[in-house]
Structure formats: structure tokens, C-alpha cells
């Protein structure tokens, strides 16, 4: 178990429900917001030695108190069990109907569904330069295997972000990422470059918030798109966390691509356990298949909770409603993740 996870669970059992500052520590989905909440909450107050040590260690990762003495690496290797709706990257097991035309797919290219076991490897690096100025790099790789179909697939990604504090409550983040997925039938690659402006705020009636305005340049195997991103994260006075994400993409000629997407996220401590819920609504359009326009509406719901310091459960459901029935889809997700 890495040092940050140890810190989290020490706080989980010792600080839960005691003050607003406990929310700053427990709701760590947004590191910058969590640290801002901490600094504002403990200013002018006396804290015990252990709490001060934990807070200092956390804030050093963002460049406070002299920052990290050297570049900090952390790694984790963990399995999970999940359900995949398309293990081999195949096509739906139904005919494609376009007007009066009907097409049948090759049975060898039909998608496979079922339980998969996955081995995941993560490596994270943090280097600090000054208060609020740091470089974060995240590496990820995984291999998933289905015993039922004797088949598997791999994922790999790298993301690097430079964060620069330009004012007491404002920062600029520049990020670049590359990802790849290899399946038996299909392969997908994507790249993105983003520029984000962040603003931190405190409202005595609501709590601590971070608003972000971002520009994203996204490129996949088949199209390139520019996107506008807006987000608003809040650690509420009532000790719960909320997040709103809105993303809008420019039209892409003759390619199905994001038109807009909205995600709502919530986290709260219930019965001494952190519980998170997410709701997503996405609309994609612009696609054309044999002269027929295609647009998709995707709705997702996700639920996540910790069942122990080293295990979490994720439940979810995805529904896709397409203007071309062939691409309609719906599937559940259920996974158990164990870390050490």
C-alpha cells in the first residue's frame, strides 16, 4: 500500500466527522481543491502533532514547505475482476438495417462478452519546483483476460501535466496524454493536449470550490476535434463532495464525434464509508454510414465504495441509443479492485 493510501485511511478513521478540515482530507478527488480547503480550514488553529505531520506531507506534494526533496515515484500492481461488453473489439450480433437494405455480419467478427480478470500496473511521478508549481506524470498498463473466450486485450496510457500557480487562487495546467488499446479484432489510439485555467474560491454558505475552463485538442485514429471543457468541484460545508463537468466538441465532418457531454459526481461518508455516485449524459453526432446520418445518446451511471483499506467495488450501467439501431447497446459493469 502506498504512503498516500496509508495517510488516507489514518485520516478516515481518526478525523471523520470532526470538522470541515476532515472533509478536505477525505474528499481527495481534486488534490488542489483539497489542499486549498486544508490551508483555509486550519489557518490560525491549533492541530495535534500527527495531524500536522500528515497535512505537511500532503502539502509538500504541491510545493509547500519547501516541496519534495527529490522526484517522488510511487507504483502499484493490483488485480481486478470485471465484466466486459466487448472483449475482442467485434461487431454487434445483429443485422445492420439501413432503410430497405439489410446486412449480416461475419460470425468471426461478432463481439464477445463476459467476465474478465485484469492485472493493472500504475506508476506515478511528482517533481515540485515551487509553491503550486509541479510536474505530474502518470503511467498505466493493463492486460485483461477472459477464461470463457480464451481471449484478452491490453491497455496502455501516459499522461503528463505541468501545473503553475500564477496567483494566490489561480493556476494554469498544461497536460498531454497518449493512450492505446489492442484487441483481437480492433485497435484504438488517441492523443490529447489540454490547457486549463483554474480558480479557487470559498463561500461561507457552500464551502470550498474550484472552477476550471479548459481547451482540449483531441486526436483519435479517425478524427481530430477541438473541445471546450468547464468544471466546478466543491467540498461542501456539510461534508460532501460534488463535481460538475461539461464538455462541448466542435462538429467533425462525416465522423461520429462528441457534441456535448455532462457528468455529475457526488461523494459522501455514509456509515463510516466513503460512497461515490456519477451520472453521465453524452450526445455524439456527425456520423454517416452509407448515406444515413448517425447520432448516439449515451447515458451512464456509476457507483463506487471502499469495502476495506485495500479493496473497492464499482457498479455501473451504460445505455447507448443510436439513430441507427445496429449501434444500440446496453450493458452492466461490476468490478472488484484490490490494491496492495
Language-model region placement:
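Outer-membrane beta-barrel initiation region
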Residues: 23-159
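Classical Sec-dependent N-terminal signal peptides that target proteins to the secretory pathway
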Residues: 1-24
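Repeated loop/turn-to-beta-strand initiation elements of outer-membrane beta-barrel proteins
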Residues: 129-137, 165-176, 200-211, 235-244, ...
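Outer-membrane beta-barrel "beta-signal"
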Residues: 312-316, 327-340
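Transmembrane beta-strands of outer-membrane beta-barrel pores
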Residues: 79-85, 127, 141-147, 176-184, ...
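Residues that define the transmembrane beta-barrel architecture of outer-membrane proteins
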Residues: 113-121, 143, 150-158, 187-193, ...
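Outer-membrane beta-barrel transmembrane domain signature
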Residues: 91-99, 237-243, 247-300, 304-306, ...
Amino acid at each position: 500500500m502506498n504512503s498516500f493510501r496509508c495517510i488516507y485511511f489514518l485520516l478516515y478513521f481518526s478525523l471523520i466527522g470532526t470538522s470541515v478540515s476532515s472533509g478536505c482530507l477525505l474528499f481527495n478527488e481534486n488534490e488542489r481543491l483539497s489542499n486549498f480547503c486544508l490551508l483555509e480550514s486550519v489557518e490560525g488553529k491549533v492541530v495535534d502533532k500527527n495531524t500536522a505531520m500528515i497535512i505537511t506531507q500532503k502539502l509538500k506534494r504541491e510545493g509547500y514547505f519547501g516541496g519534495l526533496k527529490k522526484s517522488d515515484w510511487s507504483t502499484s500492481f493490483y488485480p481486478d475482476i470485471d465484466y466486459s461488453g466487448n472483449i475482442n473489439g467485434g461487431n454487434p450480433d445483429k443485422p445492420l438495417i439501413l432503410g430497405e437494405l439489410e446486412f449480416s455480419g461475419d460470425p468471426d467478427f461478432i463481439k464477445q462478452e463476459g467476465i474478465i480478470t485484469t492485472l493493472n500496473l500504475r506508476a506515478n511521478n511528482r517533481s515540485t519546483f515551487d509553491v503550486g508549481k509541479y510536474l505530474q506524470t502518470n503511467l498505466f498498463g493493463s492486460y485483461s483476460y477472459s477464461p470463457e473466450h480464451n481471449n484478452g486485450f491490453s491497455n496502455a496510457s501516459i499522461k503528463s501535466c505541468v501545473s503553475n500557480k500564477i496567483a494566490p487562487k489561480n493556476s494554469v495546467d498544461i497536460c498531454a496524454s497518449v493512450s492505446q488499446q489492442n484487441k483481437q479484432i480492433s485497435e484504438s489510439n488517441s492523443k490529447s493536449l489540454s490547457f486549463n485555467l483554474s480558480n479557487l474560491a470559498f463561500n461561507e454558505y457552500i464551502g470550498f470550490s474550484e472552477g476550471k475552463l479548459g481547451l482540449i485538442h483531441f486526436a483519435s485514429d479517425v478524427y481530430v476535434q477541438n473541445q471546450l471543457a468547464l468544471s466546478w468541484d466543491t467540498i461542501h460545508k456539510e461534508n460532501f463532495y460534488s463535481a460538475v463537468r461539461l464538455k462541448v466538441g466542435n462538429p467533425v465532418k462525416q465522423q461520429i464525434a462528441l457534441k456535448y457531454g455532462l457528468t455529475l459526481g457526488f461523494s459522501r461518508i455514509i456509515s463510516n464509508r466513503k460512497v461515490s455516485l456519477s451520472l453521465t449524459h453524452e450526445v455524439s453526432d456527425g456520423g454517416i454510414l452509407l448515406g444515413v446520418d448517425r447520432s448516439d445518446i449515451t447515458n451512464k451511471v456509476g457507483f463506487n465504495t471502499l469495502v476495506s483499506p485495500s479493496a473497492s467495488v464499482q457498479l455501473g450501467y451504460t445505455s447507448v441509443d443510436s439513430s441507427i439501431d445496429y449501434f444500440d447497446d446496453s450493458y452492466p459493469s461490476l468490478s472488484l479492485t484490490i490494491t496492495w
